[in-house]
Each structure stands twice: as structure tokens, then as C-alpha cells.
A protein has these predicted regions:
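Signature of multi-pass transmembrane helix bundles
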Residues: 1-185
Length: 186
């Protein structure tokens, strides 16, 4: 688990560092150098920060799919679908009459991880049954047709709840037993 986590997250760390540092620079320029938050410069710096974190499901989807020996673009596509304006935060959606819970998946980790792991099993199953002559288009098509609804209806909402619970647990540990939690989390 630790090795896979490192393979997935380490290539993404530079983007997260850049995003955080750019936000710090923007805030310094706004607070101490008179840069207007409405200026083009501030907006560009904010866009760099936002892209670094908001598109996290895309980056994670790509990396995890690559580590799991799938086509990385399929993991990125699943992440992009999850954060698309048509899905993320949209209310009243359904798929074939099954309601899709409203969630904002930007900057999330657990939902895309669950989705790509599920995609792995679907991909492997389809690999065995789809004829080679049609694999190039039929396998990705069927994979997404199966994975996306399951991700949006079941795995994404469950992953969001798990992410919130994990965040709450870490916050509770840090607030109540920081002397124990800090070495464990470090």
C-alpha cells in the first residue's frame, strides 16, 4: 500500500507545492504590495493555485491508472468527468432513472481512488471477453459506460463520506491527543 501510494502521490507533489507557493505569493502581493485582487496578475496567480488543487482527481486518476497498468488517460478521463461542471455540484441528476447524489469532487482523493480501482476490475474483465479487433474502441466505451454510473451513484458519494470521516478523525486526533497523533501522522 505504501509503495503504491508513493508511486501515485509523489509525481503530483510538485504541482501541489507550486499551487501553495503561488497562492502565498499572490497573498503577499495583495496584502503588502498593493496588488488588487481584481487585477489580471492576481487572477492568473489564483488560476495556477486553483488548477493545482481543483484538478487533483484528474492527476490522481492518471497516476493511479498508470500504476495499475491501465491506460492512464482513462483514469484522467474519470477524474475529469467527476469534476466537470455538468456533474460536480449539479443537483437533480439521474442516470437511467437512478438519482445521482450531489457532490463536489474537485480537490478530492478517495472518490477517484475508489473509481479507478473499480475501473481496474472492469477493464480486466472486459479485456478477457472483447475481441481484439474491437478492443481499441469497445473496451474504453464499455468501461466508462459501466464505471461512470457506479462511480457517481455509489463509489463517489461513499468516497466523499470516507474522506470527510478521515478528515474529521485527523482533526479530532490533533485537537485531543496531538502528542500521540503527530508522530503517527508524520
Amino acid at each position: 500500500f505504501g509503495n503504491v501510494s508513493a508511486q501515485v502521490f509523489m509525481p503530483i507533489v510538485p504541482a501541489l507545492i507550486v499551487g501553495g507557493l503561488i497562492l502565498s505569493i499572490k497573498n503577499l502581493l495583495v496584502n503588502y504590495c498593493g496588488l488588487s485582487t481584481d487585477s489580471g496578475t492576481a487572477q492568473v496567480l489564483l488560476a495556477i493555485f486553483s488548477a493545482s488543487f481543483s484538478f487533483l482527481p484528474v492527476y490522481l486518476g492518471y497516476q493511479l491508472a498508470a500504476v495499475m497498468k491501465m491506460q492512464p488517460i482513462m483514469g484522467a478521463l474519470l477524474g475529469a468527468i467527476m469534476i466537470s461542471s455538468s456533474i460536480s455540484g449539479a443537483e437533480g441528476l439521474d442516470f437511467l432513472g437512478i438519482p445521482i447524489p450531489t457532490n463536489d469532487y474537485s480537490s478530492t482523493v478517495v472518490p477517484i481512488v475508489l473509481g479507478v480501482v473499480f475501473m481496474y476490475f472492469v477493464d480486466r474483465g472486459l479485456q478477457k471477453i472483447i475481441p481484439d479487433v474491437t478492443k481499441l474502441f469497445l473496451k474504453p466505451l464499455l468501461t466508462m459506460f459501466i464505471v461512470v454510473p457506479v462511480e457517481l451513484i455509489i463509489l463517489g458519494p461513499a468516497g466523499s463520506m470516507m474522506g470527510y470521516a478521515l478528515s474529521d478523525a485527523v482533526t479530532w486526533l490533533m485537537d485531543n491527543v496531538a502528542f500521540i497523533a503527530t508522530p503517527i501522522l508524520a
